[in-house]
Each structure stands twice: as C-alpha cells, then as structure tokens.
Regions:
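Short, Lys/Arg-enriched N-terminal segments with co-localized hydrophobic residues
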Residues: 6-16
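Conserved, mostly hydrophobic/aromatic
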Residues: 19, 57, 78, 117, ...
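Metal- or metallocofactor-binding catalytic centers and their adjacent structured scaffolds
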Residues: 52-128
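Extended hydrophobic packing segments that form well-structured cores
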Residues: 375-392
Length: 392
C-alpha cells in the first residue's frame, strides 16, 4: 500500500480526519402569504441540513435541494458508509456513495442527498485546514459576485401586474442591476409582464426570464420571439428537462440565450446538454447536482465546450454560501480582459429560514455579494434557529 502512495503521510497531523457522526435536520416554516410559480403553489418553505462531525468536534454543514422529508432517509442510508471514513477524502467518498446507489438513483433524491453530504465534507475540510473552500478549489478567481434578484411569484390576491411591477421597482431600488421574472402563465400574460417590467425599470437593468418548463417547444418559441426585442439576458427552462430535442429547437429558433440544468444531475446528466449544444448557459444547483465536487467537474466540462455556467440557487444561507464558494473558483469562459462573469441567483421571496439559521446574513450591496473568506463555507450556523425550525 505504501508503495502505491495510499498511506503515505496519513500519520501526520492534518492528513486525515475520521467522521464521527452524521446529523440531519429537517426544517420547515409556514409562509405569511402563499405564492406560486408555473408548476405549483407554495404555502411553506423547508430545508434539509446535514451536519458531519469529525474528530475533535469540528463540524461541517451542507444542504440538499428538494423535498426535505424525502431526502432525509437517503442521508440515513448513507450514514453507515460515512462514519469512520476519512472526511478529507471528498472525491473518494463521493464515488463511494454514488456507486452504492448507482443502480437506483442516478438522478433525483439520491443525488440531492449526496450533494448535502459533499458540501458538508468540503465545509469540514476547509474548517480543519483553516481555508475557505474556494481556496481548496484553486481560487479565488473573484472575491465578489454580481447578484440578480429572483422572485416575482404569483399571489392569491391582487392583480399580478400591479404587485410584480412594484416588486421590480423595489429590487432595483435595493441595488440589484438584474432581475429574473417567473413566466409560464400563458404566452400573452408572459409577454405583457415582460413588456411592462422593461418599460418600468428601463434599459439599464438586466431582465432574465424563467418558465420553469411550462411550455413545449412551439409555444416557447412563440413566446421567445415576442420578447426578443426586450433585451432578455436568458430564457430559463423553456421546456421540460427531459425534452433535449425541444431545447435544441428553442435554442436554434431564438436569439435569446437559453439556460437550463437546475433539474439535471451529475456530469453524466449534463453531458448530453453539452455534447448536443442544447443550451447556452448551464445552471447546475450545488445542492442538487452532486455538491461542490461534482459541480466543479460540470463547470470544467462546460468550459471545455465553451458554455457559461450560472449555478441555480433556491435554498438557505448554507446553499448561498456553497454557491458563492463554487462561483469564486469558476473559470472565465471565454477568457478576456473584461470577461462575462458568473452571477449569483439571490432569491428574494419569503423564506423565514434562509438567513435566520446563519449568524451573519449574506447580503448584497449595490448588487454585489462578497464571497465568504473564513474557513470552509465561511459561515457560522445558529443552532438555536435551526432547532426553532426543526421538525425532524
């Protein structure tokens, strides 16, 4: 074994750390006012956090995208494979967990749970070594990230144009220089919203749109052609994630950049999007697509194919911190004196848990967010707040 270099240095301080315990936290909070996107109504927000405790009591934290009550049992399944293993061997552990459920969970809940574990392992590694994750990934390429405001959901009461235009003004007044509108409520409705928002906020603010796969390719093309003149930054999830050919048709028909990938998983899942040139912008979610380990691989693949990467984010401060650490290490694509930089998706809709569970909220100033530079994710968890929202 030593001849192969597998045990060299493992007796030195800092070269290994055994995992002592895995803890899961299912969190939930009711919303003051329900809201909807093109697929469903939300009456509550939830989160699944994972805490991995290493030797010496050091903890790392991660978060899983997706339904917390369904993802938690997968973490329970992974736990015996993790306890006693070397927490610093992030890639080895990723492969171990993925291969264990490979025949049953190449996408979906198994990978979302794996994502949370992977993020927690990177947080633990960074805390153990005294470095932020972006330094362990070879960065930073940037120390602050431009954020765009996500929100613009539908409510049960009031006229959508009234409250959505007011929200657009509010986001711009708060300092955001780009916003993302939720579409998928009918082509005419979507066009009216885009036109009204562009007129209200002017040409100096970026507008992206997201249909959350509410259309088929012909409808998405009709919609896209009617809003092309509004200088749309990208058209996100125009068609269902399974419809690769539909993505290609929409991309070929429109001048608006096409974005997608929040409902895709692992490098193998993203490979067809790259090889078939189905999108212009990839959007892996760090808490869903396989964690920091896998999203860095996906980003490097995208770089080789000349595609931009803007990670999807829709979680708590843990998810935001993980995305910021990843974005800080993403390569410029293409490289240039003044390159197009990746953006941070910063959800502005109601989420009682989001910032409550971290001791120092992540904030934007003039539309920019600083990348946390303390060890690991760079955040501290408020355990009292976690217990306040915990239901399991």
């Amino acid at each position: 074994m030593a001849a192969l270099g597998l045990s060299v240095g493992l007796d030195r301080p800092g070269m290994a750390m055994k995992i002592k315990e895995i803890k899961t936290y299912v969190l939930e909070a009711m919303l003051a006012e329900p809201f909807a996107y093109s697929q469903a109504w939300y009456e509550r927000r939830g989160a699944l956090l994972v805490e991995i405790v290493g030797e010496g009591g050091i903890s790392g934290w991660g978060e899983a995208f997706g339904p917390p009550r369904l993802t938690a049992p997968v973490i329970d399944f992974y736990t015996p494979l993790l306890v006693g293993a070397d927490a610093l061997a992030t890639d080895l552990l990723w492969q171990t967990l993925y291969n264990r459920l490979r025949d049953h969970g190449q996408k979906g809940l198994a990978i979302e749970a794996l994502s949370a574990v992977d993020i927690a392992l990177w947080d633990l590694k960074g805390r153990h070594l005294g470095l932020p994750i972006h330094r362990l990934l070879g960065g930073p390429l940037r120390e602050q990230v431009q954020a765009y405001a996500t929100g613009f959901y539908r409510k049960r009461h009031g006229h959508p144009l009234d409250y959505l235009l007011a929200e657009a003004e509010e986001r711009v007044a708060a300092g955001f220089s780009a916003i993302k509108l939720k579409l998928g409520f009918g082509i005419d409705d979507d066009v009216r919203l885009c036109q009204a928002v562009r007129k209200k906020i002017g040409d100096g603010v970026g507008i992206m749109v997201d249909a959350n796969h509410a259309y088929d390719a012909p409808a998405a093309i009709r919609l896209g052609r009617r809003i092309e003149e509004l200088d749309i930054g990208w058209f996100e999830e125009p068609v269902p994630p399974e419809d690769l050919r539909g993505y290609q048709e929409v991309k070929a028909a429109l001048s608006i950049p096409i974005a997608g990938g929040e409902a895709e998983f692992t490098r193998w899942g993203f490979r067809p999007l790259l090889v078939e040139r189905a999108v212009d912008i990839l959007q892996p979610d760090t808490c869903a697509a396989g964690g920091i380990s896998e999203c860095k691989k996906i980003a490097d693949m995208a770089n080789a194919f000349g595609l931009r990467v803007n990670p999807h984010v829709w979680g708590t401060g843990v998810a935001l911190a993980a995305s910021l650490q990843l974005i800080a290490a993403l390569p410029h694509n293409p490289p240039a004196l003044h390159p197009v930089e990746p953006l941070l998706e910063f959800d502005q809709s109601e989420h009682p848990i989001r910032m409550a569970i971290i001791e120092e909220p992540i904030v934007q100033r003039a539309g920019w967010v600083e990348v946390p530079n303390r060890p690991g994710l760079g955040i501290a968890i408020d355990r009292q707040a976690v217990e306040k929202f915990r239901i399991r």
